[in-house]
């Protein structure tokens, strides 16, 4: 036997002794327990992860529902604001039209009064001019006493006709 074969023999014997001691002190059982414990821990973590995922899905559903409700509420608020704005605009338009109608009527009344005042003033001026012209004409043709009597009578006649 040469040295290499002897070394191989001793290595094989050492390996068999090592495996025998390992089996005797139950190393494979310890390794199996450790692997089983790790598998149980991983399984537990997976179950917990599933629970967390389910809770997250529920929360997501709730938040989606709340978001949808909030969007609907916002849309309702916007619609109500639009309706109120339209109502206010209509009311303001109506008030403006009423104001314009009142101001137009007032302006027409003032114009009518101004026209009546102008006509009365023109008539009064025309009467004054006619009276003055008649007085001047009669003064030239009639004596003073007869002219004064005629003037008074004419003046009374004109006043009676105008009033």
Swiss-Prot record:
Any one Pfam family match given in the protein's UniProt record, by short name: ATP-synt_B
CDD domains: ATP-synt_Fo_b
UniProt entry tagged with the keyword Lipid metabolism: no
InterPro entries per UniProt: ATP_synth_b/b'su_bac/chlpt, ATP_synthase_B_chain
This protein's GO CC annotations: plasma membrane; proton-transporting ATP synthase complex
Role noted for this protein: F(1)F(0) ATP synthase produces ATP from ADP in the presence of a proton or sodium gradient. F-type ATPases consist of two structural domains, F(1) containing the extramembraneous catalytic core and F(0) containing the membrane proton channel, linked together by a central stalk and a peripheral stalk. During catalysis, ATP synthesis in the catalytic domain of F(1) is coupled via a rotary mechanism of the central stalk subunits to proton translocation.
The name this protein goes by in its record: ATP synthase subunit b 2
Species in which this protein is naturally found: Mesorhizobium japonicum (strain LMG 29417 / CECT 9101 / MAFF 303099) (Mesorhizobium loti (strain MAFF 303099))
């Amino acid at each position: 036997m040469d040295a290499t074969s002897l070394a191989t023999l001793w290595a094989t014997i050492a390996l068999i002794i090592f495996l025998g001691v390992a089996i005797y002190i139950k190393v494979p059982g310890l390794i199996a327990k450790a692997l089983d414990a790790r598998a149980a821990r991983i399984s537990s973590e997976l179950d917990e992860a599933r629970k967390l995922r389910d809770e997250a899905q529920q929360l997501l559903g709730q938040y989606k529902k709340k978001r949808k409700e909030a969007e609907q509420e916002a849309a309702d608020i916007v619609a109500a604001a639009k309706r109120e704005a339209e109502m206010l605009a209509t009311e303001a338009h109506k008030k403006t039209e009423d104001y314009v109608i009142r101001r137009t009527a007032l302006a027409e009344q003032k114009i009518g009064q101004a026209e009546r005042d102008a006509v009365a003033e023109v008539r009064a001026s025309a009467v004054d001019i006619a009276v003055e012209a008649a007085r001047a004409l009669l003064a030239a043709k009639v004596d003073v006493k007869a002219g004064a009597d005629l003037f008074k009578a004419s003046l009374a006649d004109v006043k009676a006709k105008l009033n």
